[in-house]
Amino acid sequence: MSVTRARVWVVLTTAVLAAAFFVACGGGSSPPASAPPPSTSTTTPAFRDVAPTAADFVNLNTMTRVGDHFVGSLNGHLNAVLAVAHSKNGGAYPVGTIVQLVPTEAMVKRHAGYSPSTGDWEFFSLKVSPQGTKIVHSGAVVKNFFGGDCASCHRAAAKQFDFVCGKNHGCAPLPISDAVIATIQRLDPRPKRSS
């Protein structure tokens, strides 16, 4: 991908995502406090905690697709992640799970107690290019490129889905089509390599 095409991709993707997530997540307003975080104490396998680095965030097309999003495991326990991701009843994702819908945003499941208000998920705002990934912001409270708080959208997911927004999980639908999301995913400018 040429540098010019990569720049155009970043600008267009950021603009589309900004508008979509801003509308879908209530225009940046605070979420209702009625949805408690899911419990991870009894169903989450006890895998070691992780300290995600930029190198952990790879081209989406090298990750495992589940529905509209992509998943991976920073601990090497992809089968445990997939068991939860494919369950119609949901479940608690294991420590080290990585979930991404688009190249510029990610969430990683951290150790129990990391952030009870986010179900122990760490959110990431990423800058992607043909050279790879840079972490722009990370933590329990992350303002992404459009200025919205990641957790405010994900808190709306039904408790059994452990903060992961999927079709019929309780999150607000995105005001962009599945085709647009698929195009953004397919045009991930990062190098394709095995994860």
Where are these regions (language model features)?
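Bacterial signal peptide processing site
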Residues: 26-29
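N-terminal secretory signal peptides
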Residues: 37-95
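C-terminal motif of bacterial Sec signal peptides marking the signal peptidase cleavage site
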Residues: 22-24
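N-terminal leader/targeting signatures
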Residues: 17-18, 43
